[in-house]
Swiss-Prot record:
Keywords: Isomerase, tRNA processing
Membership in a protein family: Belongs to the tRNA pseudouridine synthase TruA family.
Annotated catalytic residues: D55
EC number(s) given by UniProt: 5.4.99.12
Xref: SUPFAM superfamilies: Pseudouridine synthase
Designated name of the protein: tRNA pseudouridine synthase A
Catalytic activity: uridine(38/39/40) in tRNA = pseudouridine(38/39/40) in tRNA
Function noted in UniProt: Formation of pseudouridine at positions 38, 39 and 40 in the anticodon stem and loop of transfer RNAs.
GO biological process terms on file: tRNA pseudouridine synthesis
Subunit structure as annotated in this protein's UniProt entry: Homodimer.
Taxonomic source organism: Bdellovibrio bacteriovorus (strain ATCC 15356 / DSM 50701 / NCIMB 9529 / HD100)
Binding site for substrate: Y116
UniProt-recorded Gene Ontology molecular function terms: RNA binding; tRNA pseudouridine(38-40) synthase activity
Coiled-coil ranges (or none): none
Length: 262
């Protein structure tokens, strides 16, 4: 008999090859580091499942994972699993909260939608403190143009134009519920997008295309044409990885209610 554990983790994606293990073996992934730490805590081999895979250099504030262990965990006896796990993790990875999850919970398959955020420093000079955590654009950006083009992202559409080449999936249709640009503070803007799911590098490709249209002075409605084309070559280049954050993963309320906090 096994116990299923759900937990959230934040990480600085700098220096990692992404969430998933990669070849050659000398590349270090976020999942690999967490699995090794969990194996030390539970004294058994742990296999980790996450809500999704982030690329090299991409960060997360609330990545959701689950694993199963042969250790029996009593939810009535408070055990700070996150404290135990963090003692085996580097400072760039932090376990935030943990629960005993029901058998039908799955970090990947149970997720209903996700929110990502992209940060851009828009100043004449780059930021020494944000260079690993945001893109830098020197020339002034017309945020109204970006916001206007983002309206064409909303709804249930085929986003094949924003799928990176070489990553085939059976279905490229996704539903976008929210897509907004705003100033986070003077000189720093953010793009927040919530959807039912995202294709590989989809958010970075959307941001890169939005900036491309704005810089070239093309009408924001061009975004609609690019989506309709279902052709990656019609879209702009991807924005750099370091500006992207996985902010939140959503699950059915029923599943959330049946998770017992540790």
């Amino acid at each position: 008999m096994t116990t299923k554990v759900r937990f959230t983790v934040a990480y600085d994606g700098t220096g990692f090859c992404g969430w998933q293990k990669q070849k050659p073996e000398d590349q270090i992934s976020v999942a690999q580091v967490i699995e090794e730490a969990l194996s030390k805590v539970f004294n058994e081999k742990i296999t980790l499942f996450a809500s999704g895979r982030t690329d090299a250099g991409v960060h997360a504030l609330n990545q959701v994972c689950h694993f199963s262990t042969h250790r029996k965990i009593d939810p009535n006896k408070k055990w700070d699993l996150c404290w135990a796990l963090n003692s085996h993790l580097p400072p760039s990875i932090v376990a935030k909260k943990a629960w005993i999850a029901p058998d039908d919970f799955h970090a990947t398959l149970s997720a209903t939608h996700k929110t990502y955020r992209y940060l851009i420093v828009n100043k004449p000079r780059p930021s020494a403190h944000l260079n690993r955590y945001a893109d830098w654009v020197r020339l002034p950006i017309d945020i109204e143009h970006l916001q206007e083009s983002s309206k064409y992202l909303l709804g249930n559409q085929d986003f094949k134009s924003f799928q990176s080449v070489g990553t085939p999936v059976p279905d490229t249709v996704r539903e976008i519920y929210k897509a907004d640009w705003e100033w986070r503070k003077p000189g720093v803007m953010q793009f927040t997008i919530t959807g039912s799911g995202f294709l590989k590098q989809m958010v970075r490709n959307i941001v890169g295309t939005s900036l491309f249209l704005e810089r070239k002075g093309l009408d924001p409605s061009k975004m609609q044409e690019i989506i309709a084309a279902q052709d990656r070559m019609k879209a702009g280049p991807p924005a750099p990885a370091q500006g992207l954050y996985l902010m939140k993963v959503y699950y059915p309320q029923d599943l959330d209610n049946r998770c017992l906090e540790l």
